[in-house]
Amino acid sequence: MMEDPLIPWLTEHGLVCHPHTLSGAPISLGSAFQLAGLKLAWRVEIEQRRVWIVLIQRVEQRRGLKNPFAALYMLANAARAVLGPDYYLYGNVDVLAGSSLSTQRLAHFYRRWTGAKELSTGWFSLKVSQVITLSNMKKRQNNGFA
């Protein structure tokens, strides 16, 4: 696997990145960092112009997440800065373990409020240039723009 182009940017912004493997296997599936109570793992696919989100996992006890989208927002910022605005975040939507939120409701959120496209059942794609902060998303919602 090639060197991940996002790691230098993420490191400069205070994150510690490491290889992501499945159950400790020696084969890397991508890279990962932890932020705001979540572990986010991804891999960059240059040919497809996408950042594939491999895993989002709660790493702290469920005490409420400060911002459940902080890790995704950070990854999108890195992709936009390093790869350019025409790359996409891509991944399968599933709720975090122990969440009372349904997968259908989370999928609706991604479609309605973020503008993500559902390419096939449960698989979403969102251009990194369209990613906005949670506070801006709430402002859009409150002003009727979402």
UniProtKB/Swiss-Prot annotation:
Keywords carried by this UniProt record: Calcium, Plasmid
Pfam families: LcrR (PF09621)
InterPro entries per record: LcrR/CesD2, T3SS_LcrR
Function noted in UniProt: Involved in the down-regulation of lcrGVH transcription in the presence or absence of calcium and is necessary for lcrG protein expression in the absence of calcium. Plays an important role in the regulation of the low-calcium response.
Protein name in UniProt: Low calcium response locus protein R
Organism: Yersinia enterocolitica serotype O:8 / biotype 1B (strain NCTC 13174 / 8081)
Gene field: lcrR
